[in-house]
């Protein structure tokens, strides 16, 4: 268990929320070693969803960007029996498929704290590791990319970075 604080800023009629945790977010640089980065962004993703009921904020859509927030659609599935989260949709945007948030399967399982059901080859498991972006792609309601041509390219073996099969299977939700 880690401390999780939230700060807010009101500017030009829009409220911005910031997740606080000194262990994960007080370092000299935003990215460090992959295992720490995976842990940090899993913590952030879980915090985002956990804070929504506390804030009384129920979005229609949560827009996730790259592997750093790809655990959100996975966690949202684990909350499916909670009426607060019913009907919330997710969009997963991929900017660069090369960066996937891959790390040790047991390390990711431990950090996420969810059941083995989510760690199979059609979900988070990826060649005996875990892949956060793969999980986000598997569970997001819609998948977007930086361009229509990139959406096509990543569905090929040449540019699909090992995920072209899943992306092709999700092609009806990919743009």
Regions from the PLM with identified roles:
Residues 1-175:
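Catalytic cores of nucleotide-sugar-dependent glycosyltransferases that transfer UDP/GDP/TDP-activated
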């Amino acid at each position: 268990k880690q401390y999780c604080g939230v700060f807010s800023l009101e500017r030009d009629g829009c409220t911005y929320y910031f997740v606080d945790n000194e262990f994960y977010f007080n370092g000299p640089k935003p990215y460090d070693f992959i295992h720490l980065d995976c842990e940090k962004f899993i913590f952030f993703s879980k915090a985002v969803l956990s804070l929504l009921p506390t804030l009384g904020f129920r979005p229609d859509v949560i827009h996730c960007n790259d592997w750093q927030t790809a655990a959100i659609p996975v966690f949202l599935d684990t909350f499916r029996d909670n009426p607060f989260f019913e009907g919330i949709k997710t969009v997963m945007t991929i900017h660069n498929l090369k960066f996937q948030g891959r790390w040790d399967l047991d390390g990711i399982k431990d950090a996420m704290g969810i059941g083995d059901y989510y760690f199979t080859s059609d979900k988070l498991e990826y060649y005996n590791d875990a892949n956060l972006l793969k999980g986000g792609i598997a569970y997001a309601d819609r998948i977007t990319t930086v361009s229509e041509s990139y959406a096509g390219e990543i569905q090929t073996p040449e540019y699909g970075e090992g995920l072209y099969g899943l992306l092709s299977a999700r092609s009806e939700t990919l743009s």
